[in-house]
Amino acid sequence: MEKIILLYSDLEGTILRESDSKYDDTDMYNFLKQLSRLQELMDAKVRMHIVSPISQNQMTDILEKLDKSFTNFNRLQKDPSKKLKYIEGAAASSKDEFVAGPQQDFTFNRFVRKMDSRIVDLKRPSNPDDKNPAGFGKLNYVKGWTSMAQERYDVKMIIYCGNGMNDLASMDYVNSKKGGFVVCPDNSRHEAKARTKLVGRKTDLQGLTEGIANINKLLEKRLNPNKEEPEDNDQQSL
């Protein structure tokens, strides 16, 4: 049975900067480098998913850019075991939430033409008065994929990267699972930071990279218990 690591991530303020909804190529390379190291330490493949209430055509554009970043990273890896799989799946707001008015037909056709097949609708709660519909949808996606993966693979670790209120339920779910970790950048709500010790001192993608690096340090410590730890090390245990 294939050994895998499930990695779920939000977008705004995590993968993408809050200021301009972009990421630097160098920052992404460093993030992917830490994921590659995680694969090596766990002897398992990372399967990454993106969850965000953005529109599905926006998600398609982002996945296209991420695919290019993964391709560029993999080209530089001589060892096949260090290469990463492309994003496995994503959830974004359903098309009908963004299709209305006289532009309906044009917009719908644009969705049909552009939408990446990996994207599914972010499920909405049955209660229209739910104050956190994105949080409901994210949790539904995370639970569904995790359950399916546990039937098909040997899931060695589950990681959730997020920073906001609509990430909290998914964070709690991942924390409740064996091998579950939550990673937050510094620009996270205090409610999110309270759910983990893996909080980066930097913002956005750099903060996530630091959090994944800290998981790698924990794994390295387990593999080499005699290795000295930094004096300011404040990490949760594996």
Residue ranges and their predicted role:
Residues 1-53, 57:
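Active-site neighborhood of HAD-like aspartate-dependent phosphohydrolases
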Residues 2, 6, 64-238:
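C-terminal cap/substrate-recognition subdomain and adjoining C-terminal extension
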Residues 29-42, 60-63, 142, 171-172, ...:
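Short amphipathic alpha-helical segments and helix-helix/interface helices
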Residues 57-58, 163:
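Active-site environment of divalent metal-dependent phosphoester hydrolases
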